[in-house]
C-alpha cells in the first residue's frame, strides 16, 4: 500500500503519565471522584492556563451531578476577577463555538459523554475553542496530584446565567445548510435524555423535517441508559415502525452521532465520514482528497477511499488526535468510528448535530435515500470489538509485558495474514481494554476476538 495515500500519526502505544486526564478530559464517578474539593481545585488551576480578560464559559449535560460540579468549578474560577458565563444545558460543541464568537478566555464542559449517569467529567477548552494542549493538561494534573491548598472564593458575584446564547450556536448550524432543506422528510431523533434535547428537535424542525423525538427530555437519571449512540435498539425500532427515512442517535453531550437508515441499518462514523467526504470530493471541496480517521476505523473504509483516489491519515484514538492531524495536514474532514465527526464548518470541533444535518441535507439535495446512499458506499470488513473489564491499576505498559497476552495477539495476526488485523487499546476513560479483530473471514474474527478477550480477562484481573 502506497505511503503517499495512507499514513499513520503517533505512537499507538504511547501512554502519558497523567493521573486525572484521560482520552477526553477528566472523568470518573461523580460522587467519589469528582468531589467539590477536587472540582474547585480544577477550576482554580484552570485560571493558570486559560489566560486573558475575557469570560470563562461553563456548559453542562443533564446529569444529576452537573449543577453541583458547575457550582464547585465556579468557586475555583472565581478567585480570578473575570466573568463566568453559565450556559446551562448545551452540547459540547456549543461551548467551543461560543468561546470563539464572544472572545472568551476559555470554557469548560461538564459531561461524561457516553458514560453512565453516575459518571461525570470536565472537558477544558482554551480561547481558540480547542481542547487544551497536553502541556496544559500536564500542568493541571501535576498541581492536582500535589494536593496544594488553594484559596476558595465564597462569593460568585461574577457568575452570569447566559443560557440565551444557545440560539447563537443553533443559528450557526442552520447557516451551514440551505433553509428548509429537509421539508417533510420524516426523521427520528434519539436525544439520549441529554444535551441534544436542548436544541436538537428545534434544529431539525427549523429545516422543515417531520421530527419524531425519543428520549427527548433532559433527565440526569436516564442519560445514556439503553439509549443514544451506544444503544441503538430503540431508535432502530422507531425508524422501522414509523417508516422514517432516517434516524440520528446522539450521546450524552451531543458531540457524536450514529445514523440509522430507513431499513434500520447502522451508519457509524466510518460510513458518515465516507459519505460526507465523497460528497465533498465530488465537488472538489476536499483538500488533497484527504480524510483523517483513527486506528479503529474499518479496513473497508480505508480500501474504498483509496480506490476513489483519496488519501487517508490514521491517528491514535481520540478526537483530539484527529483534530491535531487535520491541522497538520490541512484536512477539512475527519472523524472516528464511534461517531465523532470533525469539520472545518465548525472549526474542527466534533459535533453530532452538525454531522446529522449535513448527511440528511446532502441526501435531500442528491434526491437519494440514506439507505441507497449507504449501499453505494463500501462494505465493512467483519469487525468485532470486546471491551474487557480490567483492574484499575493496569497500565498500557503492563499489558505490553504480559507474555501470554502478547503471544495470543501474535498467533492471531499469523492466522489473519494480510487481509486482517488485531488492535488492542486500553481505554483512556474507563478500566477496560478494548480488543478488536478485523478480517474478511467473519468466523475467524469471532473466534480470535473471543480467545484474546478471554486471556485478557484472566491476565488483568
From Swiss-Prot:
It comes from Prochlorococcus marinus (strain SARG / CCMP1375 / SS120). The keyword Isomerase applies. HAMAP family: GlmM_B. Signal peptide: none annotated. Binds 1 Mg(2+) ion per subunit. Its cofactor is Mg(2+). This is Phosphoglucosamine mutase. Catalyzes the conversion of glucosamine-6-phosphate to glucosamine-1-phosphate. Its EC number is 5.4.2.10. Mg(2+) binds at residues 113, 251, 253, 255. InterPro entries: A-D-PHexomutase_a/b/a-I, A-D-PHexomutase_a/b/a-I/II/III, A-D-PHexomutase_a/b/a-II, A-D-PHexomutase_a/b/a-III, A-D-PHexomutase_C, A-D-PHexomutase_C_sf, A-D-PHexomutase_CS, Alpha-D-phosphohexomutase_SF. Keywords: Isomerase, Magnesium, Metal-binding, Phosphoprotein. Pfam families: PGM_PMM_I, PGM_PMM_II, PGM_PMM_III, PGM_PMM_IV. It is an enzyme of class 5 (isomerase). One of its GO terms (molecular function) is phosphoglucosamine mutase activity. One of its GO terms (cellular component) is cytosol. Activated by phosphorylation. The modification Phosphoserine is found at residue 113. Belongs to the phosphohexose mutase family. GO terms for biological process: carbohydrate metabolic process; peptidoglycan biosynthetic process; UDP-N-acetylglucosamine biosynthetic process. SUPFAM superfamilies: Phosphoglucomutase, C-terminal domain, Phosphoglucomutase, first 3 domains. It catalyses: alpha-D-glucosamine 1-phosphate = D-glucosamine 6-phosphate. The active site is at residue 113.
Amino acid at each position: 500500500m502506497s505511503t503517499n495515500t495512507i499514513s499513520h500519526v503517533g505512537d499507538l502505544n504511547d501512554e502519558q503519565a497523567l493521573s486525572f486526564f484521560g482520552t477526553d478530559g477528566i472523568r470518573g464517578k461523580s460522587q467519589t471522584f469528582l468531589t467539590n474539593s477536587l472540582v474547585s481545585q480544577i477550576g482554580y488551576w484552570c485560571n493558570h492556563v486559560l489566560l486573558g480578560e475575557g469570560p470563562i464559559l461553563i456548559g453542562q449535560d443533564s446529569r444529576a451531578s452537573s449543577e453541583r460540579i458547575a457550582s464547585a468549578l465556579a468557586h475555583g474560577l472565581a478567585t480570578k476577577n473575570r466573568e463566568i458565563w453559565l450556559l446551562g444545558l448545551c452540547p459540547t460543541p456549543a461551548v467551543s463555538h461560543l468561546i470563539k464568537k464572544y472572545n472568551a478566555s476559555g470554557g469548560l464542559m461538564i459531561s461524561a459523554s457516553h458514560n453512565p449517569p453516575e459518571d461525570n467529567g470536565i472537558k477544558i477548552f482554551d480561547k481558540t475553542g480547542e481542547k487544551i494542549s497536553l502541556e496544559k493538561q500536564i500542568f493541571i494534573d501535576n498541581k492536582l496530584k500535589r494536593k496544594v491548598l488553594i484559596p476558595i472564593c465564597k462569593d460568585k458575584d461574577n457568575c452570569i446565567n447566559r443560557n440565551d446564547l444557545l440560539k447563537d450556536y443553533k443559528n450557526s448550524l442552520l447557516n451551514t445548510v440551505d433553509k428548509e432543506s429537509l421539508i417533510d422528510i420524516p426523521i427520528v431523533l434519539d436525544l439520549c435524555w441529554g444535551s441534544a434535547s436542548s436544541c436538537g428537535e428545534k434544529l431539525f424542525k427549523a429545516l422543515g423535517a417531520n421530527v419524531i423525538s425519543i428520549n427527548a427530555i433532559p433527565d440526569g437519571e436516564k442519560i445514556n441508559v439503553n439509549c443514544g449512540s451506544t444503544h441503538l435498539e430503540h431508535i432502530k425500532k422507531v425508524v422501522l415502525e414509523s417508516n422514517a427515512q432516517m434516524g440520528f442517535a446522539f450521546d450524552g453531550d451531543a458531540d457524536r452521532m450514529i445514523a440509522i437508515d430507513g431499513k434500520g441499518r447502522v451508519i457509524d462514523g466510518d460510513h458518515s465520514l465516507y459519505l460526507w467526504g465523497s460528497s465533498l470530493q465530488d465537488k472538489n471541496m476536499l483538500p488533497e482528497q484527504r480524510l483523517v480517521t483513527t486506528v479503529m476505523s474499518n479496513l473497508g473504509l480505508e480500501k474504498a477511499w483509496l480506490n476513489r483516489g483519496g488519501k487517508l491519515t490514521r491517528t491514535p484514538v481520540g478526537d483530539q488526535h484527529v483534530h491535531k492531524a487535520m491541522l497538520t495536514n490541512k484536512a477539512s474532514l475527519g472523524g472516528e468510528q464511534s461517531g465523532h465527526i470533525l469539520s472545518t464548518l465548525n472549526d474542527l470541533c466534533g459535533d453530532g448535530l452538525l454531522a446529522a444535518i449535513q448527511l440528511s441535507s446532502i441526501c435531500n439535495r442528491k434526491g437519494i435515500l440514506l439507505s441507497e446512499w449507504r449501499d453505494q458506499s463500501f462494505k465493512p470488513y467483519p469487525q468485532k470489538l470486546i471491551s474487557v473489564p480490567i483492574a484499575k491499576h493496569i497500565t498500557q505498559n503492563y499489558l505490553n509485558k504480559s507474555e501470554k497476552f502478547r503471544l495470543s495477539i501474535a498467533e492471531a495476526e499469523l492466522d489473519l495474514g494480510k487481509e486482517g488485523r488485531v488492535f488492542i487499546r486500553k481505554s483512556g476513560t474507563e478500566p477496560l481494554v478494548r480488543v478488536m479483530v478485523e478480517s474478511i473471514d467473519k468466523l475467524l474474527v469471532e473466534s480470535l476476538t473471543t480467545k484474546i478477550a478471554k486471556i485478557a480477562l484472566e491476565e488483568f484481573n
